[in-house]
Amino acid sequence: MTLRIYNTLTKQKEEFKPINEGEVRMYVCGPTVYDYPHLGHARTYIAFDVIRRYLEHKGYSVLMVMNFTDIDDKIIRRAKETGEDPAKLAEKFIKVFLEDMKALKVKPADIYPRVTEHIEDIIQFIERLKEKGYAYEGSDGVYFEVQKFKEYGKLSGVKLEELRKGARVEPGEGKKNPEDFALWKKAKPGEPKWESPWGEGRPGWHIECSVMSSKYLGESFDIHGGGNDLIFPHHENEIAQSEACFGHEWVHYWLHTGFVMVKGEKMSKSLGNFVTVRELLQRYSPEVIRFFVLQKHYRSPLDYSEEGLQHAKNNLERLYNTLENIRIAMENAELAYTWDENDFKAYNSIKEARRKFYEAMDDDFNTAEALKAVFEVSNAINKYITEAEKPKESVLRKAWEFFRTVGEIFGIFEEYFKEEKAKEEEKLIELLIQVRAELRKERKFELADKIREELRKLGIQLEDKGKETIWKRIKV
């Protein structure tokens, strides 16, 4: 099956073809770290977590980068309000963010670059833009001259003439045109600052992501993602400055998540209608929150309500009940020497639902449709267990493996399969102990010691007691 992705840049679904076969380089805009993450943030990071998991499931090697904006107007403003040092404030909320994402079972990015650790890279990028004639120095900083980038607006659809209507350059601003945006801001009293060719100051917001993404993913990469609210001006400005600098197409696929809505309004800090991840986790499990998010396509608005979360909880419990029914049935199931009509019917239902699941996921990661297929399997296998005179282990195993796959992609059912995984690990350890014992009998001590050392690196310690070897888990 061919994976098709909706590209915000072209406003249509396109066949996904990475730049390098078998490899996906992906950048997701991370948080500005000045407060606790809320459900609106979590929705975006859960969505991209599932996208990443599905790409990996399809066999791609994914390199994922997510930045931390650890210096920004919002951070400076909050630090002044609380009397904290901006750097310490940012560090505190980086820790909070990482803890919250771990709690939500969001896999860590491969690289988490911070703005404050890439100041020199940012300065060099701005100098390249100046050399190419796209940037100029004003009285209060360095600006990108938007009108010089002829494709400005190709992501968001905004027109320069519309931006200029009613806009004006305020007195004291150093930019030539209202639409120009800051690449470097000259220092104001009491603000964090760094040395640069244009005097002390700090980076503008948009330049940060262009610099950090291209440093780790190259001057062209596959996927750039974030929330809908970043399409303009942030991502539009990123494209302008990056393609002006590099002289070619920068990102191939732009993906954006829909808003979380509360009574018809976007969930946001400014409106005060938000619920933090930590507040949600006091009432619901991480898997319920993930399930709630995945019931909607990632580009669609997601309506937040307690009723919606409770509905997600009930639906997830239904699937857990199905897993338990399968587990119990497998303990008493027969090996299949022949199949009857019920066996074929259940097997074909699972096979068709599995096809629908992958068809939905290949259609722009449509988790909402994919979940319908999951419930089709749930209904079919429960019916089979109830009606079949003697359920066959092979049919039950097909459903079991399907649920395991869904769990790995969606980040759910983890607790259920954890016990089974532990049993499989124990069998493998016991097998290695037997192999090691045979090697010792044959006086191949070097290989026997190699097994012991490799297991120790994995947190398994072997202890020889006479003719017996026991093992225990240790911290590594």
From Swiss-Prot:
Keywords: Aminoacyl-tRNA synthetase, ATP-binding, Cytoplasm, Ligase, Metal-binding, Nucleotide-binding, Protein biosynthesis, Zinc. It comes from Pyrococcus horikoshii (strain ATCC 700860 / DSM 12428 / JCM 9974 / NBRC 100139 / OT-3). It catalyses: tRNA(Cys) + L-cysteine + ATP = L-cysteinyl-tRNA(Cys) + AMP + diphosphate. The gene is cysS. Its main location: cytoplasm. Zn(2+) binds at residues 29, 209, 234, 238. The lineage of its organism: Archaea, Methanobacteriati, Methanobacteriota, Thermococci, Thermococcales. This is Cysteine--tRNA ligase. GO terms for cellular component: cytoplasm. GO terms for molecular function: ATP binding; cysteine-tRNA ligase activity; zinc ion binding. Its cofactor is Zn(2+).
